[in-house]
Amino acid sequence: MSSPKNEMYYSLLEWFKTLNLNAPHSDAESLADGVALAQALNQFAPESFTDGWLSKIKPGAVGSNWRLRMSNLKKVAQSVYDYYSEVLNYSLGDFAKPDVQRIAEKCDLGELERLLQLVLGCAVNCTNKQSYITEIMSLEEELQANIMRALQELESTRNASSSPEAGGVVSSLSRSSLSGILDGKALQEERDAMAQKCFETEKKMLLLIDEKTNLQQELQKLQQEVSRMEHSSTAIGDDGVSLGPVQTGSVRYNDLRRQLDLLKEELLQSEGAREDLKLKAHQQETDLLHMQIRIDELMKSSAEVTTLKDEVDVLRESNDKLKICEAQLDTYKKKLEDYNDLKKQVRILEERSADYVQQNAQFEEDAKRYANTKGQVELFKKEIQDLHAKLDNESSKNVKLEFDNKNLESKNLALQRAKDSLLKERDNLREVVDELKCGQLSSSSALAGNTVSTELQPLATVDKLQRLEAENKALREGQGGQTALAQLLDEANKRNEHLREQLKTANERILSLSHATQSDDPIFKENEFGKQIKQLMELNEQKTLQLEEAVTQSSTMQCKVTQLETNLAAREQEILAYDAKYRKCVEKAKEVIKSIDPRIASALDASVLEKNAEVVEEEPKPKMTVMEEQLMTSAFYRLGVNAQRDAIDSKLAILMGSGQTFLARQRQSAPRKSLSAMKSK
């Protein structure tokens, strides 16, 4: 028995079992994978839950990883919510969304009940809802009540944003259609039962009519026999014995009378049964007429239901159009707001564009100012590129020379080893030659000492001694040569083994190098490429660090340069003011000198034009006039201005040259030449 808590779940499960599905759907474990639910949704609304969507549901998730089941259930729940919102125009904001994780992991009946409730709503609102509603009405009354309660809960939890008119019409339609179908089905069953009863009563009536005719025939036969018996004087029985005349009080008369009474009683009973059957048939005919009238009324109500359904469809379409119009109105409102925002943004952008035009004009003026420096920068760039190319060539030449030097060193070492081996062989040969020389001297001295004694000895002994000495000499010479040859052979063998080892190592190295160069092993190549990439990344990091340092230095120096340029501009303005004052003073001095003595004025004009207002050294005079003092003060003032300008230029050169790279120093403008240098030129 199902518990009251999960009564609705079991009712929904019984309804779900009535569906014709390929996947198993008899219990909670079989529904936990979502395959049966997806197939049911595809059966309800194939235009929304398409076969492509059904193919995304993985069928082999039962009893395996619960995460696969959870992914299937997520897809099913999301598609159901989309169907309610997009197709049915339902908003399920207040309806508790089923927890698919609990269904997939623990087969929670409460969460599965919510999911089945949503699937039931899809079934009773699809295009073929009439067939599914009839299947629901074929269930037990308790199950029907639970299913209706589930539909009412689903309807009551709709969000207030959805139109209440459409929802009420849909719910009334579902209830009216359910009640109409229920009443029609009950009346159909009653009509079938009454028709069956009428058929049975007709059969009974026919049987009774047959019995009545048979009884009437038997009665006629009996009456004929009675009349025959009455007219006949004697009768013979079955055994051939005469029964005697039929008279009152006789045995035969009594028997016939008894049989006649029995037949009358049976006839009365059959007539009573016939009357009863007639009454029943009449009652059933009246009931049948009432049923027919009720069926006609139900047909009229079903026609009214269909008209109401058509009206509901029209209202639903109008509601959909109203929603579409409201959505379009909202979109137009949003577009209007966006249009106002865009207007504001356009105004802001126009203001910014005006500012940018002014900035662009300023930048063009600055570009015209710095056009001269660009040529110098390009020249310096070209020189730097040439120097880099020369540096690359020199580095490649240096690498080649280092490689040649290593080869020559290896050749030198090989020659040195060969030289050492040859020197050793020479020393060994010298020792052998010295030994041979010593052996020859000893043999010659022995022969000279024995010549005197051989003359006194007999010939046989002399011959024997000579023969023995010759053999001894030959043996000594052979032994000495063999030792020398053995030493030479050993040295040659050692040298040969050493050369073989060197050849072996060289061949192994050649094979390893050739294998390394011609190897197609991707792991080796990946290692080599990895090493090269690491080296390049390290170089790149170093270059980026150097570049960042250079950028920071350039930014700081740019700030300093801008400050110094502002200071320099202020100084130049001051110098121009001082120059104007100086010229005024000089003109006043000239006017004063002209007023005093025109000859001195002409001489002073010539000296000022030739040497730019420098003080002309003259012979010492006994007394200094006022004009001379004024000229000296003006010259001293001019000298101070020039000295100050030179000091500023030297400070600028020091600041611009310190802490900068070669390119940064070349980019800076050269300091102005002093007035004294210009004058000297």
UniProtKB/Swiss-Prot annotation:
GO terms for molecular function: dynein light intermediate chain binding; microtubule binding; small GTPase binding. Homodimer. Interacts with microtubules via its N-terminus. Its main location: cytoplasm. One of its GO terms (biological process) is cytoplasmic microtubule organization. The coiled coil domain mediates homodimerization. GO terms for cellular component: centrosome; endosome; microtubule; synapse. This is Protein hook. Keywords: Coiled coil, Cytoplasm, Cytoskeleton, Developmental protein, Endocytosis, Endosome, Microtubule, Synapse. Residues 6-123 form the Calponin-homology (CH) domain. Involved in endocytic trafficking by stabilizing organelles of the endocytic pathway. Probably acts as a cytoskeletal linker protein required to tether endosome vesicles to the cytoskeleton. Involved in modulation of endocytosis at stages required for down-regulation of membrane proteins that control synapse size. Not involved in synaptic vesicle recycling. Required in R7 cells for boss endocytosis into multivesicular bodies (MVBs). Has a role in regulating adult longevity. Residues 135-439, 482-584 form a coiled coil. Belongs to the hook family. It is found in: Cytoplasm, Cytoskeleton; Endosome; Synapse.
